[in-house]
């Protein structure tokens, strides 16, 4: 279990998410990359502002044999068809299978690309267009390494066209 603030959408067909993992340098051991390469899967779990302190604590450098679930007060939820645990009760649970691993020479980080295999969310969070409303799930967004905020709907636009101005949705 680790706090990763750098997940991003990479494609829809197949559904892909990517993330950047920090390098294993200095005195801090980093087990996330090793675990991902070994198990070839991971879960992405949304959390509310009420759980931000617990989630932030997962970024502490725990020893390899220490469960961050136990140390940070989360309960693990295992699904029969998936090889990584989810956070029990998380309103947004995404399970990814490792598809590509790219070490980045520029700064020693690693880009991990996964294909979404499991997606669970409250049906009330699905918008009419099929997208998900993070604010309806009460989820937080992470800014940088240490700031947690709640998103709101903001502005949405139809796909841009060269022949017309932006069209609000």
Predicted segments, located by residue:
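Basic, polyanion-binding surface patches
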Residues: 1-169
């Amino acid at each position: 279990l680790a706090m990763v603030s750098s997940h991003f959408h990479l494609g829809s067909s197949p559904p892909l998410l990517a993330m950047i993992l920090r390098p294993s340098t200095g005195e801090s051991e980093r087990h996330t990359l090793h675990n991902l390469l070994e198990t070839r899967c991971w879960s992405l779990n949304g959390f509310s502002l009420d759980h931000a302190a617990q989630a932030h604590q997962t970024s502490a450098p725990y020893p390899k044999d220490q469960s961050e679930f136990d140390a940070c007060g989360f309960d693990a939820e295992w699904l029969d068809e998936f090889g990584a645990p989810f956070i029990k009760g998380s309103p947004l649970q995404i399970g990814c299978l490792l598809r590509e691993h790219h070490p980045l020479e520029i700064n020693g980080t690693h880009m991990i690309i996964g294909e979404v295999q499991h997606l669970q969310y409250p049906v009330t969070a699905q918008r009419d267009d099929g997208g998900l409303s993070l604010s309806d799930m009460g989820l937080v967004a992470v800014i940088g390494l240490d700031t947690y905020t709640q998103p709101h709907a903001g502005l949405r636009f139809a796909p841009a066209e060269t022949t017309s101005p932006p069209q609000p949705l």
